[in-house]
Amino acid sequence: MTQPNLMSDRSTRILRTAGWSIAALLLIAPAIAMKFDHTGVNWTASDFIFAGVVFALVGGLFELAARASRNISYRAAVVAAVASGFLQLWITLAVGIIGSEDNPANWTYIAVVLTALSVSAVAIGNPRALSRAMAVMAGLQLLFCALHLVDGHFTAVIDLFFTSLWIMSSRLFKRAADQTTG
């Protein structure tokens, strides 16, 4: 008998295969787009290497989550947290959230991601600790949002989007902890 809050091995295999396939397609897409002159896509070898490393890290985090717990809420929490971190890192390094990617205020987004990675590494496998860590990330995101506003940068919409992902992750980790302890 399977428990409704646990993911089956078959479902895990399907999602893992789909995830790595999507990462490969996302890496191949710019190469295909570059074959057409009118697309404006012009990646260098270093762009492909960077994207490959980032996709491998994201995939690796999902693999760690799959091994850490079969709980669906736990895995969904990881997806929300990784999505927030990945999007902040990708957007900041590609074009910048505040002005261009060279604006030093963009480092606040990288600081959030690095903090999330650090606290998650310490708490991995402990959904209750991860829930608290993601709540702290939401608070840090809001703190930086306030600092951006004081500095004259209106980033509230995107900051609140990232904050909502951290809160979603926190709530899902809490649900996973509650399901684990009964």
What feature does the model see in each segment?
Residues A23-T39, F62, G85-V95, L142-L143:
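Membrane-embedded alpha-helical segments in integral membrane proteins
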Residues W43-F55, G99-V112, A156-L160:
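Structural signature of hydrophobic alpha-helical transmembrane segments
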Residues S8-T12, A65-A77, D178-T181:
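Membrane-interface helix-boundary motifs at transmembrane edges
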Residues A66-R75, A121-A133:
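Membrane-helix interface "capping/anchor" motifs
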Residues V82-I110, L114-I124:
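C-terminal halves and exits of single transmembrane alpha-helices
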Residues M7-I22:
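N-terminal membrane topogenic signal
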Residues G40-V58, I72-A80:
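Loop-to-helix transition at the N-terminal end of transmembrane alpha-helices
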Residues A80, S131-L142:
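Central hydrophobic cores of alpha-helical transmembrane segments
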